Amino acid sequence: MDVIEALRTRRSTKGFSPTPVTPDALLELVDIARHSPSGANKNAWRFVIVTQRAALDRLSQAHPHCRWLATAQAGIALVVDPAATRNWLEDCCVAAYSIWLAAVGRGLGVAWAAMYQAGDPQESQRRQAHVREVLSIPEGINVPMVMGVGYPQS
C-alpha cells in the first residue's frame, strides 16, 4: 500500500481480532516513528510497547472513551519529558501519526486514546497519572496518548 492510499483508507479501529501482533511488527512501527520530524530535531519522545493483557485492561480504564483498548492486542504509549522540548505535544502527534500510517500499510488497525486534554488540565493530569501508574512511568513525564494496535475485527 502506498502512502496516499494509507492516508485515504486510514480509520480508527476500535474493534480488534484476537490475532496477536508480532513483536517484530511492533518494533517496526516504533522504528518508523523514530524517523518522524520534530521541532528543532529534538526527538524527545519515547515509546512504551504494551502487550500484557492485564496492563491493556487497566489502560482501558483511564477514561470512558478508551474502553476499546481492552480489545487491542498491543498498545504503544508515547511518553515525553516536557522539559526537553516546548513542542512535545506536536512532536508526539506527528510520531503517533507515523505509527498509524505504518500500521495501516501493514494491515493493522490503530486508534489513539488521548490522555492529554489541553482544555481540562485536571482531567489531563488524572488520565496521565493513571497511565504512569500502570506502566511505571516516572512523575513529570507526559503521556499524551496511548495507541491501541491490532488486526481489525472482520
Language model: regions and residue ranges:
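Acidic, surface-exposed loops and disordered segments
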Residues: M1-S154
